[in-house]
Each structure stands twice: as structure tokens, then as C-alpha cells.
């Protein structure tokens, strides 16, 4: 969470591999043992012989350094849903093409399985067969966001980056989309990186929360702990402004 311009979306785009880092690392699906090694290195408590292990970790799990099968695995398992569903869906493509494209690119299923799989994805987000052969402009904002979510689900990812997915929607539609996302998370064991400036949405959706201010993380912790006992002055101001 954080105010507009604090770096939330840029961070999310970096995690999704859309933007390249100028410095630092982003690790995807990092094993606990490797995480322990990196934490020791950050604390300056690493032996010289472990430097090679860090290089191996970077080449295997850093999204800006992995190649080949490791990169394909990351691209398949990290998807993104954008704030502006109208701009993120091709106006020249039918819904059937938009949702089935990831399946074709990654060769997830045979050609004769594409249509049933696409219909199944639509039904999972509350749409149906009757929506297959329409263009994005023929849908409401909430329906377009459901299509974006269906596309993100197509490859059965482990992580979905959600960039303010409800901020452009009416309040009643927001609630339905949030409930849909919550249900999908439970059914599919999904992890979300949920970007928002709405603290009530963050509290409803998040297990852990990061507060950003001017491009920096100023506070992080369990959601209820941050809300009940904020430590940073900026976090306190955010919470005070929301009450």
C-alpha cells in the first residue's frame, strides 16, 4: 500500500518481469535453504566458500538472470492483472482468443482442448460460453476485469500480481471482484501480490502488508499487527486519514 507515485506499480511490474531492475534481486520460488543463505549474506555472516553458492542461487532463481527452462517456468507461474482492463485487453481480439492465447503459446493443451478449457476458465470467473465471441468493448468494467483474471489463471500460476484491480470499478462491483479473487485463492492455493492504495481492501485481502513511501519500504509486517500497532509516522498518517 501507499499513495500514488510511491512505486507500488513499478515494484509489481518488476516482479512480473515487465520492467527490469537497475539494482538488486528478485527471487522466484526460492527454497527455504537458499533463503537462509541469502539472509546470512545480507547480515554479513557468510563464509567465503558460500559465495559460490550465492552465485548459483542467483543463476537459478533471480528472475533477471535465469534463462531457458527456469525462465519459462517463472513466466508460466507469475502472471499479472492490470488496473485498466480496457487497455490491457486487445480490442481486436475476441474473448476466446484472449484467454486461449497463453494456452497456445505455452502449449498447455491440444487444439481440440482449447475451447473446453477456455469455457472452463470463463465459468471460474463468473462468465460463460455466451461471452466467448465478443470483443472487450462489449463488456462492463467488472466483466472485463473478470476476463483479465481468467487470462491470468489460464497457465495455473503460483503467483498473480494484481495492480489495483478494483480501483476503477463501482463499489458494488469491487466487492464482487474481491470475493471472486478470495475464492479463487482458496480453490487454487494462489499467492497474490496485491497493489492498492485502499487500506480497507488491503486489510480484507492481505496476510502481510508492505507500506511504501517515495519509492521505499517504510514498514512491513502481518496485516493486523500493522493496522493495530503502526510503527512508522507515514503508516500512522495513512491509517488516520482512512478513519
Segments predicted by a language model, with ranges:
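Conserved ABC ATPase "signature" region
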Residues: 55, 113-130, 239
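Conserved ABC ATPase signature
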Residues: 135-139, 143
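A short, surface-exposed alpha-helical micro-motif characterized by mixed small hydrophobic
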Residues: 202-204
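ABC ATPase "signature
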Residues: 220-221, 229
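Helix-to-loop junction immediately C-terminal to a conserved catalytic motif
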Residues: 16
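A short, proline-enriched helix->beta-strand linker immediately N-terminal to the Walker B motif
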Residues: 154-158
Amino acid at each position: 500500500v501507499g499513495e500514488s507515485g510511491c512505486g507500488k506499480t513499478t515494484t509489481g511490474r518488476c516482479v512480473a518481469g515487465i520492467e527490469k531492475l537497475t539494482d538488486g534481486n528478485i527471487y522466484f520460488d526460492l527454497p527455504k535453504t537458499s533463503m537462509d543463505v541469502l539472509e546470512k549474506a545480507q547480515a554479513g555472516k557468510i563464509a567465503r566458500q558460500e559465495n559460490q553458492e550465492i552465485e548459483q542461487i542467483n543463476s537459478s532463481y533471480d528472475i533477471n538472470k535465469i534463462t531457458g527452462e527456469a525462465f519459462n517456468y517463472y513466466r508460466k507461474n507469475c502472471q499479472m492483472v492490470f488496473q485498466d482492463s480496457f487497455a490491457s485487453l486487445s480490442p481486436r481480439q475476441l474473448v476466446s482468443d484472449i484467454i486461449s492465447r497463453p494456452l497456445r503459446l505455452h502449449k498447455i493443451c491440444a487444439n481440440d482442448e482449447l475451447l473446453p478449457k477456455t469455457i472452463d476458465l470463463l465459468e471460474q470467473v463468473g462468465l460463460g460460453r455466451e461471452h466467448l465471441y465478443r470483443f472487450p468493448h462489449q463488456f462492463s468494467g467488472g466483466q472485463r476485469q473478470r476476463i483479465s483474471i481468467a487470462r491470468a489463471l489460464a497457465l495455473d500460476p503460483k503467483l498473480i500480481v494484481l495492480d489495483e484491480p478494483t480501483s476503477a470499478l463501482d463499489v458494488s462491483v469491487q466487492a464482487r471482484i474481491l470475493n471472486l479473487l478470495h475464492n479463487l485463492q482458496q480453490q487454487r492455493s494462489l499467492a497474490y501480490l496485491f497493489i492498492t492504495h485502499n487500506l480497507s481492501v488491503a486489510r480484507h485481502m492481505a496476510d502481510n502488508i508492505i507500506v511504501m513511501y517515495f519509492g521505499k519500504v517504510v514498514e512491513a509486517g502481518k496485516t493486523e499487527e500493522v493496522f493495530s500497532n503502526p510503527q512508522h509516522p507515514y503508516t500512522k498518517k495513512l491509517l488516520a486519514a482512512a478513519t
